[in-house]
Structures are given as C-alpha cells and as structure tokens.
C-alpha cells in the first residue's frame, strides 16, 4: 500500500548507532582532579587512568561525532571554558582553549543525527541560560542567547531520535523540576512545567534506545535524594519513582551497552563516593555496586565508542 511521505522520511532518517562504552572524568576528591575511569560495554568501571588536561571540577560532558566525547567548562580554581576531546578508544586529549562564557555546572547532551551536541545553563557570575553548540568534529561554538530559566546544576540527556532534554537545577537558590527540550537542530525550548521533586545536581542518561532518566540530586532545605524520573521517547517526564541506592548529588551518569546506563560517584554532604548504580534497558535502577576508582564528586561522564 501507499506509504505517507512522513513515514518515508522517518524511515530514511539516518540514526547513529548507540554508544557502547562510557567515561567518567575529572571532579573533586577534596581538590580538583583530572583522572578518568572507563566503563566497558557491560557497565564495569575500570580503575583510575592518570589524568590529562587541567584538573577541574563542576564541568559538563557529552558524546559527539557519533563515537567520541567532550568535557568542557568547569573550575580549575577559577572558572574556565577549556575543553578536552575523548577519542573513540577513550583517550583524553590535552586542553583546547576555551570558547564561550567561562562557567561551572553546565551539562550537555547530543542532538541531531550528525554528531552534534550542546552545553547549556550553568553558573558564571550568576545563574545563566546561555548555550554553546558542539560540531560533529568537536568544535565548541560561541555563546547562543539563552532560553528558559537561568539555573545551574541541571542534568541533560538525549532521548527519541536526535533530541535532548535539560532538567532540574538550582534557580534563584531553590531546586526546580522544570525541563527544556532540545530539537534535532539544537534549538532549546521554553520551560516545560516541572514534574517530580525539584532538585539540583542530579545526573541523567539515556536508556532503552530512545528514553532518558534523571536520578538523585539534592533539594535545598530538604536534603539529598535518590528518586528517579523517567523521560519517554516524546520527552514527557514521569513523576518520581522511589529511590534506590545511596542518596547523593553531584554525581555523573553515562550510557553503556547501547541501551543501558550507569550512575556513579557523587557525595552526600561530607562523604564522597565511588559507588555505582546500573540502569536496565527498561529504566530500573539497581542497588549499589561497590565503587571502583577515586571517590569524588563534581565530575562528568559521557558515552563513547560504537564498538563493544
């Protein structure tokens, strides 16, 4: 029978293979560090790899180019916009001079089908909503005018086909649950009313091939959290799912095995952790797995490699 043209377009739209491995890097173990920890396609995190690039914390990371990753922004003791590219074999490159407003707590997600990505939000001299796109070759662009509520310490992940979402964060001193969707051309939408408990410094990753999940974080005046919120393949955020694992914030998350994810590291007030919680391809958060690598917080993570 006849196939509608929209279905033809959808069927022919190139879809990048999902990443199989992840990398957790940089952070704060009491002071800023630059080591990295690679995660294999089974979700096993390896021991520390000696750091390359300026030690820093409160940075962001995302995949780019289909099978590589980039870490950018953060604090070396002062705010910076330097970036470090990661090859498809997980090798971290030396610093690339910064582009865009220096800031901290600015997460990132992929968008489109050409390996692009976008960093957004964060804290400069105050909460901000500026964004910086990343080309499929890993080149960071200048600032784009902000959209949505200025805030820092949200989290971000990809969902659907070529789409992304920023959610939660600290706006004006309080935790929020608002989200902002990212189109396949990298356009950030206006605020979407929050669903779930408002909080800052959660982490997020994709799972199930086309969905995402936010988990953990802290709510000012309430305390550290472990609940999660799933995101459908149309970008709809679900209400809270009861928490699993140790409550913590300032952790990181990355996908592995093509359709699963892992949340790892973080802190709860004083203690810093290296524990890990795996996410199944149906979005179920597993109980704690004993940590590997230096316990730390304020790190970032991203997927890389399309080879298992």
Task: Please place each PLM-identified region on the residue numbering.
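Polar, enzyme-active/binding microenvironments
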Residues: 1-308
């Amino acid at each position: 029978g006849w196939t509608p043209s929209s279905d033809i377009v959808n069927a022919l739209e190139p879809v990048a293979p999902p990443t199989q491995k992840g990398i957790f890097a940089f952070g704060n173990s009491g002071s800023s560090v630059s080591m990295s920890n690679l995660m294999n396609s089974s979700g096993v995190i390896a021991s520390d790899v000696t750091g390359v690039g300026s030690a820093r914390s409160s940075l962001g990371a995302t995949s780019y180019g289909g099978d590589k990753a980039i870490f950018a922004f953060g604090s070396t003791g002062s705010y910076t916009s330097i970036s470090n590219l990661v090859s498809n074999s997980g090798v971290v490159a030396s610093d690339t001079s910064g582009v865009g407003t220096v800031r901290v707590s600015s997460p990132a997600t992929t968008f489109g089908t050409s390996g692009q990505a976008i960093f957004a939000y964060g804290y400069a001299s105050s909460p901000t909503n500026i964004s910086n796109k990343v080309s499929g070759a890993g080149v960071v662009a200048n600032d784009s005018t902000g959209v949505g509520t200025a805030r820092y310490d949200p989290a971000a992940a990809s969902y659907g086909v070529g789409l992304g979402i920023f959610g939660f964060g600290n706006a004006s001193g309080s935790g929020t649950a608002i989200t902002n969707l990212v189109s396949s051309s990298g356009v950030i939408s206006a605020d979407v009313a929050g669903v779930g408990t408002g909080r800052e410094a959660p982490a997020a990753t994709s799972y199930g091939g086309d969905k995402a999940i936010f988990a953990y974080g802290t709510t000012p005046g309430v305390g550290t959290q472990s609940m999660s919120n799933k995101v459908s393949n149309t970008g709809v955020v679900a209400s809270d799912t009861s928490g699993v694992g140790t409550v913590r914030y300032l952790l990181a998350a990355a996908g592995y095995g093509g359709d699963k994810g892992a949340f790892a590291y973080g802190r709860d007030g004083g203690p810093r952790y290296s524990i890990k919680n795996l996410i199944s391809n149906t979005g179920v958060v597993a109980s704690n797995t004993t940590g590997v690598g230096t316990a730390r917080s304020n790190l970032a993570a991203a997927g890389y490699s399309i080879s298992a």
